[in-house]
Amino acid sequence: MKLSILFSAVLLGCSLTTQAQVNAADSVMSHAGGNRFSVGGYGEVALSRMFYSNNVYRYMDPGKYKKDPSHGEFSLPHVVVYLGYDFGKGWTMGSEIEFEHGGTGSAYEREYEEGGEWESEVEKGGEVELEQFWLQKSFWQGKLNVRVGHIVVPVGLNNAHHEPLNFFTVYRPEGENTIIPSTWHQTGISLWGRLPQWRYEVQFLAGLDALEFNREGWIHDGTKDPFEFEPANKYGVSARIDNYSLPGLRIGLSGYYGHSIDNTYVRNADGQESKLKGAIAFGSVDFTLDRWNWIVRGQADYGHLSDAYDIVNLGGRQSRTSPYSHDLVGKNAVAVGIEAGYDLFSQIQKLRADNQKFYIFGRYEYYNPYVRDKRQVAYEYTKKQRLAVGVNYYPLPQIVVKADYSHRFLKSPYDNEPSINLGVAYQGFFL
């Protein structure tokens, strides 16, 4: 059943037609004015009510928390500032500063891994990150570009097109956002370019850190590190190619490969880590259709992690004072999603002429970050299906007001997880 959903998403992407999106890695320098100095960005405000328990033990003893009251959250998921400069002679600089959930400070949180105890974090429930900072030299009118610095890793639909005007739901699509870093950004070297009807990119990166992997997020936290540098004992490579041959259709293929064990500070080259690799192989196919007043997007992702069974026993993971996860880690992960929306205002001449849009949409996704090794304990709650329906209203091309009803379906005896979400977002350049 799940394979049929995956292949249906792929086939649908190949049979439809869409307008090219700007790859997120190019956003910093995609302004229309052509100014040497550019300023832009995007931001999101989200208001949510969840009609299920937020107790950290709700998956361990679901019956006990079935009647817990609903809970609400108001947040700023992402606020981003772009800064770019064109030095001339093919040299450019791009940067992107991101404030997640309001920035940093001091906060408390509760985690199942910590036995549900309150844990102090040196953060304000959020982060301030330099998501991009790079220097680039372009050749042959952009057919080849060499970019060095901190760059977006465009693996999967969500990372390549993560700005809020590129998805219908109030929050980023859950599947990819769960199993891989999002937004995925690392320091490395990128070779990329545009040809007629094609865009390509290959990247050489520092490896991910297996000590940060966990059951509920697979390799999602693999880019985290507590140091002032990215450990690069091991390396990774990513690649992406997009095709725009058909009017209104973009089809993309992307992937990542790298080793993750013993990619931390200090190395333990003589211990168990020296015998293990933690090789990550991840592949994704995605598409976007923007034609005939429809927008349809879809993606199918699958990943494999070698030595997953042994990661839980790596040095540094089992100590009570360890900052790393104590979880089991799945050997595979999967995420499949598709969404479609129709612009009702396209049928009203006055609103169409005013460039206003009103999409009614639906989204379905299935994801599982913990496809286990047969020797590992089963945790059936990691298998989730999600259905979301809602609307997007664009009073201006750069601003969207969103509303959706989302419902996660979990296997019995776990409780389903419905929620209502409202949001507003902007995306654009000021200079």
Set out the residue ranges of the language-model regions.
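Active-site glycine- and acidic-residue-rich loops that bind
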Residues: S182, E228-Y235, K275-A279
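Short glycine/proline- and charge-enriched loop/turn segments
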Residues: Y57-Y65, Y112-E114, L165-P173, I219-G222, ...
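Outer-membrane beta-barrel pore domains
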Residues: Y52-N54, Y65-D68, W118-E123, H161, ...
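Positively charged n-region of N-terminal signal peptides that target proteins for export
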Residues: M1-I5
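Outer membrane beta-barrel
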Residues: V28-F51, P69-A210, N233-V237, D242-R250, ...
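Loop-centered beta-sheet repeat module
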Residues: E212, W218-T264
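N-terminal periplasmic/intermembrane-space "pro-region" immediately following the signal or transit peptide
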Residues: L6-Y59
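Active-site rim elements
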Residues: E121-V122, E176-N177, K224-E228, H326
